[in-house]
Amino acid sequence: MLIIPAIDLREGNCVRLVEGRLDRETVYSGDPVAVAGMWQSQGARMLHVVDLDGAFSGAPKNLDVIGEILSAVSIPVQVGGGIRSMEAVERLLELGAARVILGTAAILKPQLVAEACARYGEAVLVGIDGRNGRVAIEGWGVTVDKGTVELALEMKRLGIKRAVFTDIRRDGTLRGPNLEAIREFAAATGLKVIASGGVSNAEDLRALKKLEPLGVEAVIMGKALYAGTVKMSEALAIASGEEAEEGACCKKESSPAWT
C-alpha cells in the first residue's frame, strides 16, 4: 500500500480544510515547494497536489506553484482541482504531472473523461467525493443525486481504472476513515482505489492495509502528517508491512517547519 502525502494549495499556500470548508482552514506553510521536498526526503514515493482555488472556481489557478513542485521533486505527483477541460489535462501533463484527477468533470463532462482516458490511459483518474453516499462536486459545494458506486461504475465503463475515493465527512477531521464505505466502494467497483479522508493514527492505517486485497492500493494522508499524529516513517512501515519490532529504533525525521 502506498502512502501519498497531500499538499492542498490555496492562494499559493499549503493548507488543510475540514470537510472542505473554507471557514475551517489551517495554513501550514507559505512554501509548498519546500513541503513537497520534505515529504520526498522522508520517503514518500508519490505526492497528491490539489488546487483548491481551481476546485472552487472551475479552472486551475495555482499552475505556477504546481509547476515549481513538479520541477523540485523526482517522485511522481498526481494533481487535481478544477481540471474540467482537455486543455487543463494536457497542460498539467506537459508540466510533468504523472496523473491528473477529474472530479466534477465526471458528473458534468463524462465525454471529457472518455476522451482523456482514450488519449492518456491510466494517467487519468477520477476523484469521487462522497457525502452520506452521494456524490459532491464543485469544491464539494453541490451534492448530486447519484451514488458514489453508481458513478464509479459509469466511469469504469468509460475506461477509468483507478479512483480517489474521499469521504467528505471525514476529510481533515482526524476522526478515522469510513472503513465500511471504502470497503463497499472497492468491492462493488473493482477499481484500484486510493482512499482519502480521516486517517488519524497508526491503527487507521493498519485497518486500511487489510483492505488491500479488495483493491485499496494507496491512502492519501493530510492532517495526520501535518499535525504529527502519525510520523511518515511509521506510516511507511505499516503500509509496506514492515513495522519495526517493539523497541526498535526508527530513522529520525526532521520536524515539520510548522511544529
From Swiss-Prot:
The active site is at residues 8, 129. GO terms for biological process: L-histidine biosynthetic process; L-tryptophan biosynthetic process. InterPro entries: Aldolase_TIM, His_biosynth, HisA_bact_arch, Isoase_HisA-like, Isoase_HisA-like_bact, RibuloseP-bd_barrel. One of its GO terms (molecular function) is 1-(5-phosphoribosyl)-5-[(5-phosphoribosylamino)methylideneamino]imidazole-4-carboxamide isomerase activity. It comes from the Bacteria. It is found in: Cytoplasm. Keywords: Amino-acid biosynthesis, Cytoplasm, Histidine biosynthesis, Isomerase. Pathway: Amino-acid biosynthesis; L-histidine biosynthesis; L-histidine from 5-phospho-alpha-D-ribose 1-diphosphate: step 4/9. The keyword Cell membrane does not apply. Its main location: cytoplasm. Disulfide bonds: none annotated. One of its GO terms (cellular component) is cytoplasm. Pfam families: His_biosynth. It is an enzyme of class 5 (isomerase). It catalyses: 1-(5-phospho-beta-D-ribosyl)-5-[(5-phospho-beta-D-ribosylamino)methylideneamino]imidazole-4-carboxamide = 5-[(5-phospho-1-deoxy-D-ribulos-1-ylimino)methylamino]-1-(5-phospho-beta-D-ribosyl)imidazole-4-carboxamide. Its EC number is 5.3.1.16. Belongs to the HisA/HisF family. This is 1-(5-phosphoribosyl)-5-[(5-phosphoribosylamino)methylideneamino] imidazole-4-carboxamide isomerase. It comes from Pelotomaculum thermopropionicum (strain DSM 13744 / JCM 10971 / SI).
